[in-house]
Amino acid sequence: IDTTGSIKTKDNQMSFGLENFWEDDNLYSFSSVMLRPNGIDVYLYRGASKMLEHRKLSIPWNINSIGSDLNSFNINTNGYYSESKFNNQGDKIYFLDSTNDTIDQYSLSTPWDISTTTYDSKSFSVSSQEASPSSFSFNSDGSKLYVIGGMSSKIMYQYSLGTAWDISTASYDSKSFSFVSLDTYVPDFTFNATGTKIYVAGYSNKSIYQYSL
């Protein structure tokens, strides 16, 4: 993202303007923002207060139309959760514990209803590969996990899950890719729906970079 509010890609330098934005009085207290595939339900996690919040967009995919809290859920953890991700079905949620370098797994007895969240007593440590993980992502069927060290190594690591979406069955594939020349800090990344593209955020350069697989 450059100073004109445009996103540029690494492959072909295409860009587009960011027309919508949203500000909150406590914006910087959010460590993670998740959007349900319906484009209506928004889930916000505040790392400092350990509070997961659910809100709705009155206009799908338009963040300016976000409403007030519908419900919230306090996550009881001794670490600091810096990022969170749902699985595709909305019945699992995963948190990246940047204090202990683990990914912790929770279940929702009613999909997408955070008031039904319980800890599965399942976690996976990435400390053998990365001491400062900044982001993670799953592939579409939950059989692969990807973790990136945003500020220290700037390396993405690949893991396999023996049982899909069960974080306790993860194991390192001995596969990695370095983004060390990209930026001084790469805080986040995401894949496209088919897994053929990776989009990596560069903090210092205020850019989003596109890679092909």
Tell me what each language-model feature is:
Residues 1-213:
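Polar, enzyme-active/binding microenvironments
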